[in-house]
Amino acid sequence: MSNHGLQMPEGVHVEEVSDSEGQFVMGPLERGYGVTIGNALRRVLLSSLRGLAITAVKIDGVQHEFSTIPGVTEDVADLILNLKEVRFKADEMQEGHLHLNLEGPGNWTAADIDEATAEYDVLNPDQHVATLAEDAVVNVDLRVGYGRGYVPSEENKREDDPIGVIAIDSIFTPIKNVNYEVKPTRVGQKIDYEELLLDVETDGSLTPEEAITQGASILRDHVSFFIQLEEEPEPVVEEQEVDEEVKRIRELLAQPVDELDLSVRSHNCLKAANIKTIGDLVRREEDEMLKFRNFGRKSLQELVEVLDERGLQFGMDVEEYLEEKKAS
């Protein structure tokens, strides 16, 4: 690899590291590269890594966030602020729903949420949510979603949400803090070089090393398009990789649509249309889907996004995958 005559760093040294905090040192660097790399990594880490957060809450007897709950010290607005601080970890980034039955007296903490689910791990169980008096009885439903950065409540609203569901702002980013510092260093007798010190703190859902690796990969994947301007196109995917992709899609097509974890409205529409498997679904065209009763543009967009996440789309010719299955 050409270094274009520039002083290249010897590597990245890990100074301190724990499950949630780490310091990384890169050097030596040409003057100016510390800020260039440090600032780019910091912005990507804060904005582009995926995480889990509560996206909506429903409390029996509560119609809006300006309500109060009998026997609960905090009003709903304060309760929501506390729920925003609850941090989750899961083996897979997927949406889920939790139900809690709470009775006073006592404190409602994130530990109660942790006990209500086997799908997610709560990383800050001591997080206070609300104070319940002796006569307090609170039934709560929580929707947990995944995303990047900060998402306002308006974007978490769904047209098929029942009355009483309150969409909330979500802080998805798993990064709590990123700071960098550029210090002078020397190479031999030359002292006009730099080293970059990058401090990363996560919420514990991923390690600082994992966070740095993901952030650097995102940067690399974007910048690589400029590198490829004068390069030959990428070679065709090897036969074995193609076979693995065919196998993956074949298995997906055989799964029931229940595996897509759709909203109630979309699920009921598919059930009414007798669409039982993902294969049945992707055979359809988008225009055809809109003809089904109670199936609107928002439901269609939900399905388009869910299929896209799995490398699928409407109007697929699934016969080649079925033929593969017969041939095997």
Curated annotation (Swiss-Prot):
SMART domains: RPOLD (SM00662). It comes from the Bacteria. Keywords: DNA-directed RNA polymerase, Nucleotidyltransferase, Transcription, Transferase. Its EC number is 2.7.7.6. Residues 1-230 are annotated as: Alpha N-terminal domain (alpha-NTD). One of its GO terms (molecular function) is protein dimerization activity. One of its GO terms (biological process) is DNA-templated transcription. The N-terminal domain is essential for RNAP assembly and basal transcription, whereas the C-terminal domain is involved in interaction with transcriptional regulators and with upstream promoter elements. This is DNA-directed RNA polymerase subunit alpha. The gene is rpoA.
